[in-house]
Amino acid sequence: MISDLTTLLFFPGGLSMLLAGMAFTWLDRKLLARLQNRLGPRWFQPLADMVKLLAKEEVVPAGVNRLLFVGLPVVALAGALTAVLYIPLWGLPPAASFPGDLVVTVYLLSLLTLCTGLAGANSGGRFSLLGATRTLTQLFAYEAPFLMALMGPALVAGSWQIALITAGINGRWLLFTQPIGFLVALIGLMGKLEMPPFDAPEAETEIVAGALTEYSGRGLALFYLGRSVEMVLGLTLVAAFYLGGLSNPVAFLLKTLGLLLFIAIVQSLMARLRIDQTVGLWWRYGALLVLLQWLVLWGGRWL
Amino acid sequence: MHTNEHTQKAETFIVPIGPQHPALREPGHFEFTIEGEIVTAASVRLGYAHRGIEKGTESRNWVQNLYMLERICGICSHIHATAYCLGVEQLAGVEAPPRAQAIREMVAELERTHSHLLWLGEAAHEAGFETLFMYAWRDRETVMDILEALTGNRVNYSANLLGGVKYDVTGEQASKIEQGLDYLEERTRHYLDVVTSDPVFIQRTRGIGVMTAVQADRLGVVGPTARASGVVRDVRVEAPYAAYTAFPITPVLAQAGDLEARFVVRLRELFESYGVIRRILANLPPGELVLKRMPRRIKAGEAISRVEAPRGELFYFIRSNGSDTPDRVKVRTPTLCNMASVLTLTVGRHLADVPMILVGIDPCFSCNDRGLVLKRGADHEHWTWDRLRQIGLDYYAGERGSGGVGGTSISPAPLPPCPPALLTGMHV
């Protein structure tokens, strides 16, 4: 009982995850800033942002469903924190595991995007509505290729259970045998986190802050935290699947940070894609390339 | 000013951009009717930053006005002062010495460099290309440093005087400018390469906001926006002023007329600027910086002064009644000429292209805002100054309650207070 509570509230879930999320957010912002010839935030900036946002009044716009408005950020963060339990954080075996937990995890990770979309549609503002439309459009664009990319290692290991997949990979670097899957998974993660060049849903020069325009205070803080947690989870998942499965925590952390550096570089290199260009990119190239990867994998089996 | 009313459906979805919006650095109000992501109609309302500068000139003397007009625009301040000085000199029947004219041109070209680099960053930011934004603005610091070394100021250089300029160029400064230009030239070449070869960026610029030469001519666009559509419209070439006869430039043209062409034209213009600055530094005419005597009262008459600001043609009309203050100063900035093209070009495009098309003309709202037309249904009568004043007083009296302003509020509502919704359109 006490050990279960510790798992949920402190490690690997709960508090440690929130701190890790903020640390990763800081590192992402700092790396991006240095690549863009800026100074970037100080190390405690994400924490300071959270403290400030949580302390501020949460303004609920008139005419919205109050329960949804307040509840959606909580669900979004809860979804991300639940997914923590099934993911091999820091290279350690996941805290919980059951057959098929890969699908559940991917679903839980999508909850944040879904909640963001609903929150935007619920807010009623024009920018929120447009942002919500774009968020959900983007969800349909990257989600399938992302899931398909994560299934590549699952095919190799012959299981849908994350613990078994990482065990089945057994130290092999699938990055070299499935480079397309690796790239699609990582870029899909960027789409999920609405990072440039996939930041059309929150393009500030067009629709202010997109779906979250009306959010302030606690709700905004929870959405931000959810996104931070999801960044750690996504990077962990890709590192575990494509960069040699479980290993000692220090080596694993280094691999995760390497991936973070990679996405920071990609973010700094590109202009924002229009939403129709994003959708086109994912379905014209992302999905087809992953399918190609699958065919190669299947073909390889018969050889 | 211009409204395309395609939509009569009740469920039109209008995206308001401005007066406060992250895409705008200055207040302006746009309404874009969209269907899905496609813009079907666009309208603009300007005038939020009307500062009454033209009226203000009438209560200041000729010299004081120089400093006020320079503050019309924070980016192209020098060119405003130049236009004014040239106009006043024309009225007074004098001409600044050749050395002063050359220095005027040099500062103007340095200003163009700073303005175009600033615009490059701004446009990259609208496209979500933050890295280019940061790098362009970092390199812009070089030209800001040059301007500071030359005149002591980064923004309002105050280089002009009636009948000349205030600052000379020393040999030391000249070599510093040369060094800066070398660096900027190398960087500009790199940026030109980026905007014409980066595949993601090209997706956002190539073939977007295409304006044909015919359209450009009909819409009356000016400056780089016109030149990107293949229309030769450059005051520096058509009607050379200052030292542009001695140190000419070649107008930079592009035929495509899309956003990419606007990037290319502005960046290639920088090379022209670097070249002409180098030539001026090498062949700076000797002589005085300023006329020995510039009259304090300017002869009665009218003058028109046109110059090429970084954004396009800047127009000054100056009328003197022979006193030490102008009778009328009228300023038309290039943004006004280009604004109509934004409304035309955004219709039928994606909402995501709108900020790009808007920034493509390099808009400058507060330079542009001169006043408002008060529209009241079919009431087209011309209001006298006294009546306009009374409306203003009543308007603010109504806002502040029954107190009134200086006791001038006589009846509760001789004219109904004018809500902002009635302040439509824009008057030049």
Identify the function of each model-found stretch.
Chain B
Residues 2-428:
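Active-site bordering "gate/hinge" segments
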